[in-house]
Amino acid sequence: MPPRRYNPDDRRDALLERINLDIPAAVAQALREDLGGEVDAGNDITAQLLPADTQAHATVITREDGVFCGKRWVEEVFIQLAGDDVRLTWHVDDGDAIHANQTVFELNGPARVLLTGERTALNFVQTLSGVASEVRRYVGLLAGTQTQLLDTRKTLPGLRTALKYAVLCGGGANHRLGLTDAFLIKENHIIASGSVRQAVEKAFWLHPDVPVEVEVENLDELDDALKAGADIIMLDNFNTDQMREAVKRVNGQARLEVSGNVTAETLREFAETGVDFISVGALTKHVRALDLSMRFC
């Protein structure tokens, strides 16, 4: 019987709801960085080299294979700059595999606006597509196992929900969104609370329907967390023999998450121990942007 407090769909639903609020704010902040602190396409002095009434058609092409992500951010960039004056034609959707030299979308509208929004739009789509592409690679390495890939809170400041959305597009799943939707009890929480049991019992009392996860560093701490009734137990820097022993001891009474020393080389080995989740901070912390470019036609 799965732990009663944990529903893996809750985090996805919460993210998709919150992101509707976050996208306009994130785009506005990015545009203000380019436009002297305000969202005004007229502040782009280089774009003023073109006549105001010049119309243009542009294409955005990927230079390498990957997974596309960022459609709504691109749309929001041009909505904020020019309302409905820019028309976007999409050839892909978020989560689609893309291939080198493929046209992913086209733009038609005022040339000044296309140039002003180019870098901001590409910054979002290259970053998010880069994350989605790496996640898809990791998910492929887990094929045939029962282990699910999770992200973490190790995200670029200001882009938490965007990066976690990219993880979903790549086929991964979300760990907690922040500090309000799940308990994650670590060493210092335990010391301050007095014991694992006291910390877990207090968490259940405060928020009975919120999942409680406990991080452990050895098998004795695992036993304590299990006896306390933790929903999820995070195995921090366990070796594979310890992971197998943890799976045996828990025997389905809680879910097990592996964290620490996870790379593309170790991922499969860790999954084959039988753990439920592997969380990888590098997915949203060490971001390699996918190579896309915009060209006027």
Curated annotation (Swiss-Prot):
Modified residues (Blocked amino end (Pro)): P2
EC annotation from Swiss-Prot or TrEMBL: 2.4.2.19
Coiled coil: none
One GO term describing the cellular component: cytoplasm
Superkingdom field: Bacteria
Metabolic or biological pathway, per its Swiss-Prot or TrEMBL entry: Cofactor biosynthesis; NAD(+) biosynthesis; nicotinate D-ribonucleotide from quinolinate: step 1/1
Biological processes, Gene Ontology terms: NAD biosynthetic process; quinolinate catabolic process
Record-level Gene Ontology MF annotations: nicotinate-nucleotide diphosphorylase (carboxylating) activity
Protein name: Nicotinate-nucleotide pyrophosphorylase [carboxylating]
UniProt organism field: Salmonella typhimurium (strain LT2 / SGSC1412 / ATCC 700720)
Gene from which the chain derives: nadC
